[in-house]
């Protein structure tokens, strides 16, 4: 494991432990609200928030999580399943 200038542990592909923990916390929190929400607007807002997060996410981390699937976390039909998968993978990386 290497250290970058900020002292963050660098994992393979330039992904820091902080990056993984941040993504896990964000996805975990949004998933918990999403799975219990009965408000369609709130669920849409969560999908939008995740899409915005993905846009700014470390590209190497997204590639690792998505396994090359370009619509990962961005497809309405598979959104909840993708969030669960991302959360599990991120938890395993911590």
Predicted regions and their residues:
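Short terminal alpha-helical segments
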Residues: 2-38
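Short, intrinsically disordered, low-complexity terminal segments
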Residues: 6, 20, 46-48, 83
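Generic alpha-helix initiation/capping and coil-helix boundary signal
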Residues: 16, 42-44, 79
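Short amphipathic alpha-helical heptad-repeat segments
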Residues: 19-27, 50, 54-61
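Heptad-repeat amphipathic alpha-helical coiled-coil interaction surface used
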Residues: 24-27, 34, 43, 50, ...
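Charged, low-complexity interaction regions
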Residues: 32-44, 61-62, 72-74
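Amphipathic alpha-helical interaction surfaces
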Residues: 33, 52, 56-63, 89-92
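Amphipathic alpha-helical binding modules
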Residues: 65-94
């Amino acid at each position: 494991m290497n250290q970058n200038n900020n002292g963050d542990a660098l994992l393979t592909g330039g992904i820091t432990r902080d990056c993984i923990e941040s993504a896990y916390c964000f996805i975990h929190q949004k998933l918990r609200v999403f799975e219990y929400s009965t408000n369609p607007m709130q669920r849409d807002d969560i999908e939008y928030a995740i899409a915005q997060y993905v846009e700014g996410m470390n590209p190497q981390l997204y590639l690792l999580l998505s396994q090359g699937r370009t619509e990962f976390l961005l497809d309405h039909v598979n959104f909840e399943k993708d969030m669960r998968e991302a959360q599990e993978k991120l938890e395993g990386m911590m």
